[in-house]
Swiss-Prot record:
Protein name: Omega-hexatoxin-Hvn1a
Top-level taxon in the UniProt lineage: Eukaryota
PROSITE patterns on file: OMEGA_ACTX_1
UniProt site (Critical for insecticidal activity): P56, R81
Expression across tissues: Expressed by the venom gland.
Bridged cysteine pairs (disulfide): C50-C64, C57-C68, C63-C82
Single GO MF descriptor: calcium channel inhibitor activity
Free-text domain note: The presence of a 'disulfide through disulfide knot' structurally defines this protein as a knottin.
Propeptide regions on this chain: 23-44
Gene Ontology process terms (BP): defense response
Length: 83
């Protein structure tokens, strides 16, 4: 076993031991059960984002300007882009 392999093995071992120790701590037991209902929804809810001007837009409501029009590209193919 060379030095690099030994270092990697020690890091893996330390990580495993740390995870086991964290699971047995009383202050972390049941930590995820406290996230119920609305609190859990807030964690996993996506924040509203909008598509900036000049970017392709699938729907008008996703554009920051709330406006999406067809524009002709160099290939003469019209593409919907945010205004």
């Amino acid at each position: 076993m060379n030095t690099a392999t030994g270092v990697i093995a020690l890091l893996v071992l330390a990580t495993v031991i740390g995870c086991i120790e964290a699971e047995t701590r009383a202050d972390l037991q049941g930590a995820f059960e406290s996230y119920e209902g609305e609190a859990a929804e807030k964690i996993f809810r996506r924040s509203p984002t909008c598509i900036p001007s000049g970017q392709p837009c699938p729907y008008n409501e996703n554009c920051c300007s709330k406006s999406c029009t067809y524009k002709e590209m160099k290939t003469a193919t019209p593409v919907q882009r945010c205004d």
